């Protein structure tokens, strides 16, 4: 029986394995492991790719989001408006930066922060709005940014899943005051482990990010801020440099696979992903909705097909928040999605045989 894993990291690395091996050899010969030539080159290349003003590599997506928030030096106890449907790292970054997460509901089609839910969540303590480009679908940024400007708030993109995604022709990472990316190894642009990236519009914000990233280290013997160890290393930067040139082609293949799925599943009793007309989705995750999620997941497992759930427990119901200040607005759409969502394999290395196996297996589950 054809095997279709949810992700296939071996296949993803096959085209660049020799290039990465050669780059690693050069790094080992030189033994400059942090903030060296590969880091500096990748920072320049990815900043240009995002059409951002400034950019900085760091150790993970969670650290990137934390850096992006801390760089603005908000007052302790500031409120950050975030979508309730997101990976928990979005919430963690707010808490780590000394803030209070305020969770709002999502748009029922895009699954991103619903701009119409934001204004009612704003209080005198609100400092920042943090839309998440969930699954690789850009949030509707223009109304969010306008609303933030009207209330003198900052906007930080959580672009952890949005490498190469575009909003009205503009790349994720260039749409707000700052943005945070994750290069976790399963991402569309993934490291060989962990890494992250922040972009910013203001050079002063970037300089504060640099200090925070490296222990507040201003000169050899001087630390001007209480910072962190959030550096990206040369090995991860070398991997990302090897992968970046293929990102657009890989995203295009994800869109082609998603289109095949959408057509094949159009008559079935399920909801397929919606790509907003203003967005160029990168399909980091191909997420469907069905009332029979657990049954379908079990059936696909029997067919040797991997699935996932992104995400089963809404952020506002996580036990970690019981002792942490937070607010949750009405979240009916989030609750419904978390009860019904299922992720199917959708990545550029899938073969035609694997794609057809997924299509046939899903079709057999729902019947004629």
Name these PLM-found stretches.
Residues 70-159, 166:
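PLP-dependent aminotransferase-like
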Residues 174-211, 217, 234-237:
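Active-site PLP attachment segment
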Residues 56, 81, 102, 155-156, ...:
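Structural detector of well-ordered beta-strand residues that form the stable sheet scaffold
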Residues 157-190, 220-224:
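Conserved active-site segment immediately N-terminal to the catalytic lysine
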Residues 10, 38-45, 49-55, 116, ...:
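PLP-dependent aminotransferase class I/II
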Residues 92-94, 147, 171, 188, ...:
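Hydrophobic/aromatic ligand-binding patch that stacks against planar heteroaromatic rings
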Residues 31-79, 93-97, 103-105, 170:
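Phosphate-binding glycine-rich loop
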Residues 1-30, 37, 345:
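N-terminal "arm"/small-domain region of PLP-dependent enzymes with the aminotransferase-like
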């Amino acid at each position: 029986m054809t095997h279709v894993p949810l992700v296939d990291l071996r296949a993803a690395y096959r085209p660049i394995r020799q290039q990465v091996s050669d780059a690693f050899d050069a790094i080992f010969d030189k033994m400059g492991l942090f903030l060296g030539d590969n880091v500096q080159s990748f920072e320049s290349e990815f900043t240009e790719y995002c059409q951002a003003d400034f950019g900085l590599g760091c150790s993970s997506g969670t650290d990137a989001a934390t850096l992006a928030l801390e760089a603005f030096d908000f007052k302790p106890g500031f409120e950050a408006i975030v979508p309730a449907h997101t990976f928990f790292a979005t919430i963690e970054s707010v808490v780590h930066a000394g803030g209070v997460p305020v969770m709002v509901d999502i748009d029922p089609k895009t699954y991103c922060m619903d701009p119409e839910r934001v204004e009612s969540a704003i209080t005198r303590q609100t400092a920042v709005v943090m839309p998440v480009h969930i699954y690789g679908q850009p949030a509707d940024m223009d109304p969010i940014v306008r609303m933030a400007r009207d209330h003198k708030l900052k906007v930080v993109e959580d672009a952890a899943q949005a490498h190469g995604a575009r909003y009205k022709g503009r790349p994720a990472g260039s749409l707000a005051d700052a943005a945070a990316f994750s290069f976790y190894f399963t991402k569309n642009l993934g490291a060989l482990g962990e890494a992250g990236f922040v972009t910013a519009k203001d050079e002063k914000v970037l300089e504060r990010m640099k200090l925070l990233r490296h222990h507040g280290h201003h000169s050899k013997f001087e630390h001007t801020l209480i910072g962190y160890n959030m550096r990206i290393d040369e090995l991860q930067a070398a991997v990302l440099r090897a992968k970046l040139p293929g990102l657009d082609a890989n995203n295009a293949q994800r869109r082609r696979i998603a289109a095949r799925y959408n057509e094949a599943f159009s008559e079935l009793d399920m909801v397929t992903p919606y790509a907003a007309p203003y967005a160029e989705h990168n399909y980091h995750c191909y997420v469907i909705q069905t009332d029979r999620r657990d049954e379908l997941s079990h059936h696909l497992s029997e067919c040797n097909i991997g699935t996932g759930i992104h995400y089963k427990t809404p952020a506002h119901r996580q036990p970690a928040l019981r002792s942490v200040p937070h607010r949750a607005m009405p979240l009916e759409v989030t609750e419904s999605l978390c009860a019904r969502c299922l992720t199917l394999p959708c990545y550029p290395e899938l073969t035609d045989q694997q794609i057809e196996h997924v299509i046939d297996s899903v079709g057999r589950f729902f019947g004629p």
